[in-house]
Amino acid sequence: MLVISRKSGESFMIGDSIEVKILRIEGSEVKIGISAPSHVKIYRAEIYQKIVKENKMAVQVDIVDLSEVIFLDRNK
């Protein structure tokens, strides 16, 4: 992991097109701004983890349901 120290008002770049700017520091909270192309998806980590979990659940196939489909197809 790369660790970068920045003060309020300073920024850093990720690649050529993503800028992360430190807007404000209040106690233990840091407010940041991110400038990125519209095709770049930006999520808070906890939201991204929920999306990944939901996607995994959506593609799970119940083995019993799958075997029923195979059985029904053979009886045609």
Swiss-Prot record:
Main location (coarse class): cytoplasm
A family per Pfam: CsrA
Domain of life: Bacteria
Annotated GO MF terms: mRNA 5'-UTR binding
Keyword Ligase included in the entry's annotation: no
A GO term from the CC aspect: cytosol
Subcellular localization: Cytoplasm
Keywords: Bacterial flagellum biogenesis, Cytoplasm, Repressor, RNA-binding, Translation regulation
Record flagged with keyword ATP-binding: no
Stored Gene3D superfamilies: Translational regulator CsrA
GO biological-process terms attached to the record: bacterial-type flagellum organization; mRNA catabolic process; negative regulation of translational initiation; regulation of bacterial-type flagellum assembly; regulation of carbohydrate metabolic process
InterPro entries reported for this sequence: CsrA, CsrA_sf
HAMAP family to which the protein is assigned, alphabetical: CsrA
Protein family according to the UniProt entry: Belongs to the CsrA/RsmA family.
Reported function: A translational regulator that binds mRNA to regulate translation initiation and/or mRNA stability. Usually binds in the 5'-UTR at or near the Shine-Dalgarno sequence preventing ribosome-binding, thus repressing translation. Its main target seems to be the major flagellin gene, while its function is anatagonized by FliW.
Subunit structure and binding partners: Homodimer; the beta-strands of each monomer intercalate to form a hydrophobic core, while the alpha-helices form wings that extend away from the core.
Protein name: Translational regulator CsrA
Gene that encodes the chain: csrA
